[in-house]
Every structure is written in C-alpha cells, then in structure tokens.
C-alpha cells in the first residue's frame, strides 16, 4: 500500500516534539545509574581500621548506601583500631558520626576492645553505644538477617 509523503510528515511533526521533550528525561536517567530501592535493608559493617582516611570513608559509605536504599538501617561496629572512630580524642569523623546518628544510624563500640585498651565510655563520642563483644554483635545481626560488610583493611 502506498502512503502519501504528507502523512509521514504529519507523523514526524507529532513525534519530533515528543522526542525532544523526552531527551532531558532520558539523559538524566542515563546519568543517574543509582537504583532506588525503598525496601528496609539492614546492614551491619565491621570497622577495625585506625586510619583517619578509613574513618572518613566508612562514614561516606553510609551515604552511598542511603542514596540507593534510603530506608536502610545501618550499624557500624567498631573494634580494635576502628574504635578510634568513636573516641573523642582520635576521631577524624566525629561530625559525620553525629550527623548519621541523628538520622538513625548506629555506631557501636566493642566493650572487649575498650577493656583491652583501657578506654571508658566517657572517652567515646556521646553518640556511641557500647556492645559487650563486636563478634557477638556482628553474629547476632547476621542471625537476624542483616547483611554483613567489612570496611577498612
């Protein structure tokens, strides 16, 4: 069947404005490769690194997760050298810890590490919670269905 050239022009006349209207949306979708998932994910992160850059990185990782999973529940369990993140005298990310705990994130200090290093609750940032054992806390969270990750070296 033969179609008239003007009918093709009419189709283009209609389709081109629609295509141009969609271009910004398509470009934005392509640039934003983050997948937003509103499910309530639960993540427990082991942090045992005393490096100051690692302290900042672990707090940045929270932001990375929350950009994709805004309803995620996150707990950072600090042990060994990672306890420095929660110490008032050594933390390089105390502002970030305060900001994230205000948004519901949990920063837990291992009591066994505290005893071994002669650290008291008063030595910690006010936002820190103390758990009896980092390993027990991590295992308990995993048994409750939390995903486990390790940050730092």
Language-model segments: residues:
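Bacterial Sec-dependent N-terminal signal peptides
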Residues: 1-31
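Secreted/extracellular ectodomain signature
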Residues: 30-153
């Amino acid at each position: 069947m033969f179609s008239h050239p003007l009918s093709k022009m009419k189709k283009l006349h209609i389709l081109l404005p629609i295509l141009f209207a969609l271009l910004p949306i398509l470009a934005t979708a392509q640039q934003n490769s983050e997948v937003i998932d509103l499910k309530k994910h639960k993540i427990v992160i082991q942090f045992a690194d005393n490096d100051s850059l690692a302290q900042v990185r672990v707090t940045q990782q929270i932001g990375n997760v929350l950009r994709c999973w805004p309803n995620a529940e996150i707990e950072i369990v600090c042990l060994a050298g990672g306890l420095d993140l929660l110490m008032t005298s050594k933390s390089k990310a105390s502002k970030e810890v305060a900001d994230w705990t205000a948004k519901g994130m949990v920063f837990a200090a291992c009591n066994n590490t505290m005893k071994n290093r002669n650290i008291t609750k008063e030595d910690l940032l006010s936002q820190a919670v103390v758990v009896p054992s980092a390993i027990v806390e991590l295992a308990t969270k995993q048994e409750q269905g939390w995903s486990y990750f390790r940050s730092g070296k």
